[in-house]
Amino acid sequence: MKNIEKSEIIISLVDVDKEFGDKKVLDQINLDIKRGDFVTLLGPSGSGKTTILRLIGGFEWTTRGEIKFNGIDIKDVPAHKRDTATIFQDYALFPHLSVRGNIEFGLKLKRIKKKAEEIPDVVWKKFEHLKKKWQDKQKRKIKELKILQAHLEKLLENPQLDIKKRKKLQDKLDDSDFRYSNWENYLTSKSESFKKKYLTRRITKQEINKEITDIIDLVGLTGNENRAISELSGGMKQRVALARSLVIEPEIVLLDEPLSALDTKIRQKMQVFLKKIQQKLGLTFIFVTHDQDEALQLSDKIAIIRNGKIAQYDEPKQIYDYPVNKWVANFIGDSNFFQAKYIKKNQVEILGLKLYTIHDEFIPGQKLDCLIRPEDIDIDLNSGYFKGKVIQNIYKGSYYSLDIKVENTIINVETNDFYDLETQVFIKWDDDAIHLMEMENAEI
């Protein structure tokens, strides 16, 4: 496993907007992803999560904003020049090639560094000379663009501008931002082109064979090298797609709902496998899904996307236990919500009963949403906070899901014990099971 410094930001999206015609699909996206993290973009269909992935991969252009890779804006860099590999939902494997042929495809273009003794001194001198010229040109062009952008921003401050003129100026500013990104990457692009031509060589057949053998062993495909893609199961196709992406040694692997077509058992196995591979190699994985359980199991961090905005970005446990609002809580898991009133420090009123809470950040008298997860509620036949009766009992395999009616409120509870319908029970919970948040009227 690589020694990864996780405090380092590898990808940063800054004030990113994306518009398709008159429709804005992403609105002020700000997202920092640390090197070596497994980050999931989670949201309902049409929320914008796949668009974010495509922007990072270079398959779509931003309307405005920055996509920084190791601190440099790369929004104008084409997909094939980004240090990423993408695994698509349909795998995008070549049906006419074998397992080996699919994996080998990217390696044919791979180049590796020449040994220092293989490079004449004159080449290094030429590189240093050209590098100075490229740096000077880069500085000059960036300075010109900064002056232009300052001028355009000043003009846009005028409140008297009509809509047509404002749009024209904004378009010029957006265009200059793309050109700025291009010149930010100018030195790197020129240097990489020079290095590719003079300081690297093509990978040999022997080296290709070794890399293919190593990656096939890593993803568990040994013995299947010569099989046709049409002969493989969904899980094996997924392993081929993963091997093809990993063998080119990208810094970031982008995964667009790659497990959605698999049946439940294979999908669960592939979830474990993906996480194991990611941790072993220390790569950055950015994963798109609409499956909440999948996101919670796989991720170091989750970005929940709603209507083109990031609703919450945090570690899975933080999002599950401390959602920022009612919508996030409902989306990430089963929920019981109550209207609550904050009485004073560490005291809240729920269903007419004053209870202790660990929360101390609200104002006395403030009306709040109160979340209590079904698995955090305990059932007792003798005593508790509230008395109710069981009106629904569903067996879920490892637990029972009960609906308990307390006066006019239905409360969902998960329990290992069976209770007959109409059974009178009491319910209670620990102090830290109460999660308070500011009220939000929107429903999922």
UniProtKB/Swiss-Prot annotation:
SUPFAM superfamilies per the UniProt record, alphabetical: MOP-like (SSF50331), P-loop containing nucleoside triphosphate hydrolases (SSF52540)
Q: Which InterPro entries match?
A: AAA+_ATPase (IPR003593), ABC_SmlMolc_Importer (IPR050093), ABC_transporter-like_ATP-bd (IPR003439), ABC_transporter-like_CS (IPR017871), Mo/tungstate-bd_C_term_dom (IPR008995), P-loop_NTPase (IPR027417), Transp-assoc_OB_typ2 (IPR013611)
Compartments where located: Cell membrane
Q: Which UniProt keywords apply?
A: ATP-binding, Cell membrane, Membrane, Nucleotide-binding, Translocase, Transport
Mind naming one GO cellular-component term on file for this protein? ATP-binding cassette (ABC) transporter complex
Q: Does the keyword Transport apply?
A: yes
Q: Where is the ABC transporter domain?
A: 11-332
Subunit record text: The complex is composed of two ATP-binding proteins (PotA), two transmembrane proteins (PotB and PotC) and a solute-binding protein (PotD).
Q: What is this protein called?
A: Spermidine/putrescine import ATP-binding protein PotA
**Protein species of origin:** Mesomycoplasma hyopneumoniae (strain 232)
Q: What is the lineage of its organism?
A: Bacteria, Bacillati, Mycoplasmatota, Mycoplasmoidales, Metamycoplasmataceae
